[in-house]
């Protein structure tokens, strides 16, 4: 109609004659030429000519169009090197355009043009470095904000794709950025330049960052005039630390970080709190423990609520940086090798190289060049799977991961037994075994000397200096009895490798000296531990008199001068006290095995609370983490603080190790009963990871009750448990695992019936659970759920359920005898193959199709048990069933060799059925019965059919 109206208007303009080329009176036909019949001037121009024409246009949009079409122009002239260079020269002129939108449009195209130049480098060498990079660098200081932003994005994109040569980065990019961050530079430009420097540091590497970027970055951290600059530095501090490495971080960056953490602007301090974990990862354990911990405590107690909030969110990740294999107890062991073979291999491996922390070695095998700060003795593995082995091993081979402090303070009993085993129990070897077999560098010694003065060392009663050899000769009088170690292990003496540091009288003196400083949380914790030890030792004094005398004699004979390289760190003072306490009471001993932890029920609740002292992380940090469940924190810090605590808990648990799980147990139970479902949901999604960390014994004792509670929680919480149901149940003992068979049915019931994804996830998990249960359990408990899901209202749930049923058929048929498999097939035929509803009969065809595709049944068995019932559906009254049957027979069944090679009666029956379907009255049935199997995908067609039956 629009064309007719235009035609009428043109006819009325007779005077002009415009638009009328010819008029034939005979045919009365008006011929109107199209605009395509004319050749425009632009088409007559070369690509370079069009570029020049529009680049010189006064119309801004034309110049923008030129910038947008530069890449296409380059592609047109890429065969001619001169034309390519000419286009690049036009780009340089276009970069001087006075209109900011044109410059911004040009900068958006630069990364694409640079990539093109890189791909065509032989024809246009150095094109990017000569023509494009100077424009990008110049625009970093452009007056227009949009142009600067696009140039910054372009620069980062070019660096990320490695399109800028290293030489150009050093000579063209970095000098400009350093100039832009000069004191007299524009404030906005300076802030943006600092951000660019920080973001490009990981891309350019350590060398360039350390030489060119780091000095200016340190200056910007101290920018007194612009807090925005300091805030950018603080926000990117972790990235810079991770690039430059540990030495540069500790020497140059940490002093600036301390200044930023005490900045008078709360936004700067908040940025420091957010990147604290990354900074911690770039420092050594000693600095992390002695300096960063105290700094972090200051941030947690910051006057600004926003700083405290960020600090508490980073607390869990920061604690996780203290993790190492010796404290977490997580390391790999090849189950196929015996303990003796592992020890021999480790001994050979550690002769020529420094032993890593996650390698199992005996104490006598520890190389002498290990430093105290990084060494850890991991003895023979006594995880729960090897508890029976551990009971028959010497005490010196118990698996106890030790940190550097415990390495210097191994118990005399453990060393005596180790010496007896290796040196025929000669008395002269006690001294050599007590002497540390690790060396310290001069730097480590200096640091340890500085930390020797602390509250514990200052107020404690000095240990007596007694000659060890003389006292041993007086008390032993000769060789120790070969039965000595066995007798000690049978008595009430604890098997912990710790030194008894004081007698009961000395403990009382320690408490008396510490009481004036009870305001200090660390001192208070020490006093509580010592008090509990005194009470416990007095209760059991009449039972342990003999064993305590023996141990106190050995303790009095320990000469401190024999341990010149063993200093005690400030943070290690608390665990050493607790170690002494644990040695004085058999109920307070250091445990690594899961079975011991789960069976150790001699603590009263008060005593267990008082003994939450560990040596993996500074106790003050752990106390702050445990306080995150305090209701007052939600009011004074963050309403989501409990959720952050729950999110970080698996990492904290891994850091502390399963031997310190008692420190977190109460907190975990508090979080599991939190009123906010988001907190419980977070725990539900990670409970399987925590179970791996704790092992089966602790999981059964502490996690299973909470897991059971989650099963009855809201759907938002239950989905977290359901998504990792297999991962959790496989860690449980078979008897405990079978208890959940009765509860799987409950997952079919949801708060909202429309929550079909819940049922789909259940089907996915049931497929994985098949391997955990016996054929009888699968048939009795999982089969009803699977058949229920096959009849679900939602096609996606049904589709996964078909896979579940087929895997179930495979497992049950492979069992001996295959009775359960035959019964399941008969039930499928009865409930689905002969179902009065057409959707049930369609489901039967889907199951048969999946069984064939996944080879869940041998074809001869399929032909006997399922195929006869499948072929009867060729006469089904519903076309959808016949369509799916035609697809299954033609595209799946006939692809199997069994039906291609053999000329059996089964093959004849299939061919007759297909011929009948080819003559079906429904066109779709005819099509799929006649189509070649390779011309379409069965899964796509099947899914389309399934979705049509929602």
Curated annotation (Swiss-Prot):
Gene3D superfamilies: Leucine-rich Repeat Variant. It comes from the Eukaryota. One of its GO terms (cellular component) is protein phosphatase 4 complex. One of its GO terms (biological process) is protein phosphorylation. Widely expressed with high expression in cultured mesangial cells. Isoform 1 and isoform 2 are expressed in renal tissues. The modification Phosphoserine is found at residue 935. SUPFAM superfamilies: ARM repeat (SSF48371). Residues 326-374, 413-438, 473-499 are annotated as: Disordered. HEAT repeats lie at residues 1-25, 26-63, 65-81, 82-119, 127-164, 168-206, 208-246, 248-285, 287-324, 505-542, 568-606, 698-734, 799-837, 861-898. GO terms for molecular function: protein phosphatase regulator activity. Keywords: Phosphoprotein, Repeat. Residues 332-365 have a biased composition (Basic and acidic residues). Disulfide bonds: none annotated. Regulatory subunit of serine/threonine-protein phosphatase 4. May play a role in regulation of cell division in renal glomeruli. The PPP4C-PPP4R1 PP4 complex may play a role in dephosphorylation and regulation of HDAC3. Plays a role in the inhibition of TNF-induced NF-kappa-B activation by regulating the dephosphorylation of TRAF2. (Microbial infection) Participates in merkel polyomavirus-mediated inhibition of NF-kappa-B by bridging viral small tumor antigen with NEMO. Serine/threonine-protein phosphatase 4 (PP4) occurs in different assemblies of the catalytic and one or more regulatory subunits. Component of the PP4 complex PPP4C-PPP4R1. Interacts with HDAC3. (Microbial infection) Interacts with merkel polyomavirus small tumor antigen; this interaction bridges small tumor antigen with NEMO to inhibit NF-kappa-B. This is Serine/threonine-protein phosphatase 4 regulatory subunit 1. The gene is PPP4R1.
């Amino acid at each position: 109609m629009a064309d007719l109206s235009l035609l009428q208007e043109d006819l009325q303009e007779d005077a002009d004659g415009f638009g009328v080329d010819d008029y034939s009176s005979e045919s009365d036909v008006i011929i109107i030429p199209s605009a395509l019949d004319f050749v425009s001037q632009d088409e007559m121009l070369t690509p370079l000519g069009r570029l020049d024409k529009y680049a010189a246009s006064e119309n801004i949009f034309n110049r923008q169009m030129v910038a947008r079409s530069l890449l296409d122009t380059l592609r047109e002239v890429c065969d001619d090197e001169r034309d390519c260079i000419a286009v690049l020269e036009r780009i340089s002129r276009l970069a001087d355009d006075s209109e900011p939108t044109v410059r911004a449009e040009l900068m958006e195209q630069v990364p694409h043009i640079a990539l093109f130049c890189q791909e065509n480098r032989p024809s246009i060498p150095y094109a990017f470095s000569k023509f494009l990079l100077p424009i990008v660098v110049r625009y970093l200081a452009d007056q227009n904000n949009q142009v600067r932003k696009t140039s910054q994005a372009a620069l980062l994109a070019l660096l990320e794709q490695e399109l800028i040569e290293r030489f150009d980065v050093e000579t063209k990019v970095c000098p400009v950025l350093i100039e832009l961050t000069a004191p007299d530079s524009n404030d906005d430009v300076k802030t943006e330049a600092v951000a660019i420097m920080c973001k490009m540091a990981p891309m350019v590497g350590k060398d360039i960052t350390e030489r060119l970027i780091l000095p200016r970055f340190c200056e910007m951290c101290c920018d007194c005039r612009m807090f925005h600059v300091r805030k950018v530095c603080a926000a990117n501090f972790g990235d810079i630390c991770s690039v430059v490495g540990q030495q540069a971080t500790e020497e140059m960056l940490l002093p600036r970080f301390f200044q930023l953490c005490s900045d008078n602007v709360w936004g700067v301090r908040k940025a420091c709190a957010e990147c604290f974990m990354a900074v911690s990862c770039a420092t050594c354990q000693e600095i992390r423990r002695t300096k960063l911990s105290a700094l972090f405590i200051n941030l947690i107690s910051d006057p600004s609520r926003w700083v405290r909030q960020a600090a508490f969110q980073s607390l869990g990740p920061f604690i996780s940086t203290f993790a190492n294999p010796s404290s977490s107890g997580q390391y790999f062991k090849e189950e196929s090798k015996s303990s003796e073979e592992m020890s021999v291999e480790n001994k050979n491996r550690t002769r020529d190289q420094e032993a890593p922390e996650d390698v199992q070695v005996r104490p006598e095998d520890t190389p002498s060049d290990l430093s105290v700060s990084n060494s850890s003795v991991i003895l023979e593995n006594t995880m729960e799977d090897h508890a029976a082995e551990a009971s028959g091993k010497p005490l010196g081979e118990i698996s106890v991961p030790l940190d550097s402090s415990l390495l210097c303070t191994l118990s005399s009993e453990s060393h005596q037994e180790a010496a007896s085993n290796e040196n025929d129990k000669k008395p002269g070897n006690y001294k050599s075994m007590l002497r540390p077999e690790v060396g310290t560098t001069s730097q480590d010694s200096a640091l340890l000397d500085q930390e020797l003065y602390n509250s514990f060392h200052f107020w404690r009663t000095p240990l007596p200096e007694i000659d060890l050899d003389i006292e041993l000769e007086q008390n032993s009088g000769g060789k120790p009895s070969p039965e000595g170690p066995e007798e000690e292990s049978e008595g009430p003496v604890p098997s912990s490798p710790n030194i008894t540091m004081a007698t009961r009288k000395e403990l009382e003196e320690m408490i008396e000296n510490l009481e004036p400083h009870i305001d200090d949380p660390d001192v208070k914790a020490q006093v509580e531990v010592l008090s509990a030890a005194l009470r416990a030792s007095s209760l059991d004094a009449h039972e342990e008199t003999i064993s305590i005398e023996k141990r106190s004699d050995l303790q009095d004979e320990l000469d401190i001068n024999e341990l010149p390289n063993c200093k005690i760190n400030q943070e290690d003072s608390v665990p050493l006290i607790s170690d002494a306490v644990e040695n004085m009471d058999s109920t307070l001993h250091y445990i690594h095995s899961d079975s011991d932890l789960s069976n150790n029920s001699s603590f009263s609740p008060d005593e267990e609370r008082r003994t939450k002292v560990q040596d993996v992380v500074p106790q003050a940090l752990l106390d702050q983490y445990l306080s995150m469940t305090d209701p007052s924190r939600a009011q004074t810090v963050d309403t989501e603080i409990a959720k952050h605590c729950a999110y970080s808990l698996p990492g904290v648990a891994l850091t502390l190790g399963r031997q310190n799980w008692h420190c977190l147990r109460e907190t975990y139970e508090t979080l599991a009963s939190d009123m906010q479902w988001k907190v419980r949901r977070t725990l539900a999604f990670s409970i399987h990871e925590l179970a791996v960390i704790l092992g089966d014994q602790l999981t059964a004792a502490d996690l299973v009750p909470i897991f059971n509670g989650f099963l009855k929680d809201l759907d938002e919480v239950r989905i977290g448990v359901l998504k990792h149901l297999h991962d959790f149940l496989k860690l449980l003992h078979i008897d405990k695992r079978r208890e959940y068979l009765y509860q799987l049915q409950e997952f079919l019931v949801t708060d909202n019936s429309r929550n079909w994804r819940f049922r789909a996830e259940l089907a996915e998990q049931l497929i994985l659970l098949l391997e955990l249960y016996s054929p009888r359990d699968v048939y009795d408990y999982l089969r009803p759920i699977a058949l229920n899901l096959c009849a679900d209202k939602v096609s996606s749930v049904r589709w996964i359920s078909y896979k579940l049923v087929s895997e179930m058929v495979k497992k049950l048929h492979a069992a001996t005898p295959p009775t359960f498999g035959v019964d399941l097939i008969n039930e499928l035929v009865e409930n689905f193959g002969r179902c009065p509803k057409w959707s049930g009969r369609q489901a039967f065809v889907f199951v048969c199709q999946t069984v064939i595709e996944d080879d869940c049944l041998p074809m001869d068995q399929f032909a006997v048990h399922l195929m006869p019932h499948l072929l009867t559906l060729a006469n089904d009254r519903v076309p959808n069933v016949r369509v799916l049957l035609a697809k299954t027979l033609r595209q799946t069944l006939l692809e199997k060799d069994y039906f291609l090679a053999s000329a059996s009666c089964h093959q004849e029956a299939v061919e007759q059925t297909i011929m009948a379907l080819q003559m079906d009255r429904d066109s779709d049935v005819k099509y799929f019965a006649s189509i070649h199997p390779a011309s379409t995908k069965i899964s796509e067609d099947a899914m389309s059919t399934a979705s049509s039956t929602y």
